[in-house]
Amino acid sequence: MDWMWLLSGACIVFTLGMFSSGLSDLRVMVAQRSVENIQYLPFLTTDLNNLGWFYYGYLKGDGTLMIVNVIGASLQSLYMGAYLLYSPERRYVGSQVLVSLGVLLLGYCYFTLWILDLNSRLNQLGLFCSVFTISMYLSPLADLAQIIRSKSTKCLSFPLTVATFLTSSSWVLYGLVQSDLYITVPNFPGIVTSLVRFWLFSQFPPDPPTYRLLQA
């Protein structure tokens, strides 16, 4: 159906738009040759999440999931590579990457060699990916509480909030059409947290930029 192609295209475009938000951090790292004020953990967790969903899409034969997540994993790996290049704590960050790769390899061996039934493999992998995605969407809640206390949204990105809302909404619809709760359920928190952010922007709008008047 044509509308299904449109929905798949929307999922791809919105999700890649959300993933590309890290390009601003990449430009800062390259321009300043520094990783100051840039967090590394979101790149790593998003990369692992992308790889998990890519494998799920591969087992299910879902091209939309595969396209989105292979590009997403490539972008996150690019961000991590730049971070490793300019980080003064290169050894510590590198050790985290190696540990994560080890966990990823163990997970792959578990799902591939231990669970032989395809349906069981899909169910267990889908559950794992869903829980991981939900935890990522809910992790900024502490930051949102801090914003309420400080009554300032300076640390929030409005374009990223819009991208997250559109991405989560499109994947919820996609999961409903596919009758796949492992896709539908974990994206509901993304909608909820985005709506909370919109409310915060309405309650505590960012300060307008100030301009110095030119003296004649």
Curated annotation (Swiss-Prot):
Any Pfam family the entry gives: MtN3_slv
UniProt superkingdom: Eukaryota
Membrane-spanning parts: 3-23, 36-56, 65-85, 96-116, 125-145, 157-177, 181-201
Entries under InterPro entries matching the protein: SWEET, SWEET_rpt
GO cellular component, one term: membrane
Family of the protein in this entry: Belongs to the SWEET sugar transporter family.
Function noted in UniProt: Mediates sugar transport across membranes.
PANTHER family documented for this protein: RAG1-ACTIVATING PROTEIN 1, SUGAR TRANSPORTER SWEET1
GO biological process: carbohydrate transport
SS bond list: none
Protein name: Sugar transporter SWEET1
The organism's taxonomic lineage, starting at the top: Eukaryota, Metazoa, Chordata, Craniata, Vertebrata
Membrane topology reported for the UniProt record: Multi-pass membrane protein
Keywords in alphabetical order: Cell membrane, Golgi apparatus, Membrane, Repeat, Sugar transport, Transmembrane, Transmembrane helix, Transport
Organism: Xenopus laevis (African clawed frog)
